[in-house]
């Protein structure tokens, strides 16, 4: 290590190698309107024909290290993080160093920072043309974010002050490509709750002597309307349909970043940013695969090393899970669908779990446990739906229930039980039931939580998911 540059000999490349770290973004946009007052409406919109860049303050030493290495080397291997941001970091630096782009020969694409993972990536160096579009995507997004912020933040702020929505002279309404739609969804949700007026409604249900409840979906607007419907019914019912299905449910999907963030928010009240930082830390320590992924699948390569380490994983997290599915299944393993990054899984580099900090330990256990469930048996159950009709009024009622045949992975992961024993009935069977009226109220929408935002809203509107 010579002042931030590592000099090594690579057996794989059969060459001397200089390694220089970018320590994140070294280059940033240079404001094209340094003396431009964008807080005056007549100066908007501001649409530069081209953006220029400059080296950020405080990182010139790292930039010059890279520049010196590039001058000395025969060719360049880009080894930044394998994603849009990593690609952007690399090319923005290279664009500021004359002649460097022509020296780019390979792209290192490492989803794991274990020794084996890095060696494997070096043996499969990619052509830069395969990944450069990630840079173009990141660059286009960066330009769009700048244009939105530089133009719409002052425009919206000025307009809101004109109508008295922003009283303080120094207050600014920030506008962003992702943040503004999210704020809009939260405000809309808040207004729906604030303006919600609960309305009563009535339903009719029919019960047998054991208290088994058959329900009807009709909601009556008044007690009188429900009473009139009830008066048309008799106590006699006929079974008109019995649907029995044997079903099998595989274990939950492997984690991607969003699902892991959602679960950490739900179970431990840890926000999305903190979760990402913790997983990134585990990745950098070589214990976890690449974190910024939206995939819930792995390839056969990962499956094979996971199988080889099953017992070590069990011992590390203290879970005696019965692992019987040792052949890849399409719900978890698909070489064709894993384009760049696979799901978040433990690497073959297994830590002493007691040496991890508290949240690193929690996340490592969660990810490893979810991975082990992939090898467990399916949850098998029998699903039954019985439909009956009132003999006098022809109104239909239904009841559904599941009966567990084999708990499988549910032996290890607690879930809300849906088991409900139903009587053995056949079509045309006659029943005697007691119908009654039940009153209820319409309920306001639930508040948007971080978990709901991450798991449902962001994917639904494709916000901040790439």
Briefly describe each language-model feature range:
Residues 12-56, 165, 169-280, 284, ...:
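Long, highly charged, low-complexity internal segments
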Residues 131, 135-136, 145-151, 157, ...:
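Extended, highly charged linker/hinge segments and catalytic-adjacent loops that couple domains
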Residues 51, 58, 64-72, 113-208, ...:
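C-terminal or mid-to-C-terminal helical accessory/interaction module adjacent to the motor/catalytic core
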Residues 111-117, 161, 257-258, 278-288:
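Short, conserved phosphate-binding/catalytic loop or strand-edge motifs used
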Residues 1, 291, 325, 379-383, ...:
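GHKL-family ATPase ATP-binding module
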Residues 96-101, 126, 151, 155, ...:
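A generic secondary-structure signal for well-formed alpha-helical elements
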Residues 1-150:
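Intrinsically disordered, low-complexity regulatory segments
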Residues 80-82, 262, 292:
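Short glycine-centered, acidic/aromatic-flanked micro-motifs in structured strand/loop junctions
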């Amino acid at each position: 290590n010579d002042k931030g540059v590592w000099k090594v000999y690579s057996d794989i490349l059969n060459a001397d190698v200089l390694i220089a770290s970018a320590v994140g973004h070294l280059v940033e946009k240079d404001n094209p309107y340094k003396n431009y007052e964008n807080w005056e409406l007549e100066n908007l919109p501001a649409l530069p024909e081209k953006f220029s860049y400059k080296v950020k303050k405080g990182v010139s030493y790292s930039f010059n290290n890279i520049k010196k290495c590039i001058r000395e080397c025969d060719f360049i291997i880009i080894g930044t993080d394998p994603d849009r941001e990593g690609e952007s970091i690399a090319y923005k630096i290279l664009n500021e160093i004359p002649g460097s782009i022509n020296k780019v020969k390979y792209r290192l694409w490492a989803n794991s920072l274990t020794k084996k993972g890095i060696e494997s990536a070096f043996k499969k160096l990619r052509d830069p043309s395969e990944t450069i579009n990630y840079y173009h995507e990141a660059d286009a997004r960066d330009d769009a974010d700048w244009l939105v912020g530089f133009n719409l933040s002052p425009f919206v702020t000025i307009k809101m002050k004109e109508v008295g929505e922003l009283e303080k002279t120094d207050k600014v309404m920030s506008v962003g490509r992702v943040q503004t739609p999210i704020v809009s969804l939260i405000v809309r949700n808040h207004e729906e709750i604030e303006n919600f007026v609960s309305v009563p409604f009535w339903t009719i249900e029919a019960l047998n002597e054991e208290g088994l409840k058959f329900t009807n979906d009709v909601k009556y607007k008044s007690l009188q309307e429900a009473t009139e419907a009830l008066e048309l019914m008799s106590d006699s019912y006929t079974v008109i349909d019995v649907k029995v299905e044997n079903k099998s449910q595989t274990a939950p999907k492997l984690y991607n970043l969003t699902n892991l963030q959602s679960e950490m928010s739900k179970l431990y009240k840890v926000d999305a940013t903190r979760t990402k930082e913790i997983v990134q830390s585990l990745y950098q320590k070589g214990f976890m695969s690449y974190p910024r992924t939206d995939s819930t699948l792995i390839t056969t390569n990962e499956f094979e090393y996971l199988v080889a380490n099953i017992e070590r994983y069990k011992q590390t997290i203290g879970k005696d899970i019965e692992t019987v599915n040792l052949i890849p299944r399409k719900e978890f393993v698909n070489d064709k669908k894993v384009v760049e990054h696979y799901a978040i899984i433990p690497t073959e580099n297994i830590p002493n779990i007691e040496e991890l900090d508290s949240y690193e330990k929690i996340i490592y256990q969660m990810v490893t446990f979810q991975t082990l469930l992939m090898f467990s048996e399916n949850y098998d159950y029998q699903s039954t739906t019985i439909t009956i009709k009132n003999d006098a009024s022809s109104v239909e009622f239904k009841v559904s229930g599941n009966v567990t045949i084999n708990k499988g992975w549910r032996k290890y992961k607690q879930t809300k039980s849906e088991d409900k024993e139903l009587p053995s009935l056949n079509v045309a069977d006659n029943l005697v039931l007691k119908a009654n009226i039940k009153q209820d109220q319409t309920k306001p929408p639930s508040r948007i939580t971080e978990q709901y935002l991450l798991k449902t809203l962001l994917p639904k509107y494709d916000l901040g998911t790439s």
